[in-house]
Amino acid sequence: YFEIDKKSTLFIDCYALGVWIGGMFMYQAARMIANTGKYQFSVITPGADKIEALKAVKRLGPKFDQIIIGGYGPLVKDLIDMGEMHGITWGDYEMKYFFAAEGFTEGFRDYVIQRGGVRASFYGTINHYGTADLGTMAHETPLSIIIRRLAVEKEEIFSDVFAEAHRQPFPLEEVPLGL
């Protein structure tokens, strides 16, 4: 999805760490990928410390083909806004974002794409869902993002696909157990 097999990648884990299991799950998963030795994939863990995350982008970002920031939606938005105030031009980097824990609107995704240096709109953001005891259970795909965006744009599609929804749901792909 993020082409880590083709591009050197810096993954910045901005999920809360410590007693918050989600940040530790993300770190462990990213570390396992890095430890395979199959990819040019590095992981750093500033957690929810926005200033440290921005320092990492400035200091380490130029050394990689792409940067993936993993974080909660509101924190990522803060990073994008603060980065601009701290002299980061997000478009200078190939940025991608890996969200969790909260839903968001397509307007929010558009904001991240436009302001956050995302070059490929259907491959530059992904949201995933899970629980502390089971880990990731489902995630977005480019197809699910297209379906959601079409449904948001066209009311008749929304009512056909999401008949009982009262807000923008996420169509997701299930992650089968054992994979």
Regions found by a protein language model. Give the residues of each.
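Conserved short alpha-helical elements in the N-terminal third of ANL/AMP-binding
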Residues: M24-G37
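A short, structure-level motif marking secondary-structure boundaries and short turns
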Residues: F11-D13, E94
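Conserved AMP-binding
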Residues: Y15-G18
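Active-site glycine/GP-rich loop and adjacent strand/helix microenvironment
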Residues: N35-L179
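Conserved adenylate-forming
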Residues: Y1-L10
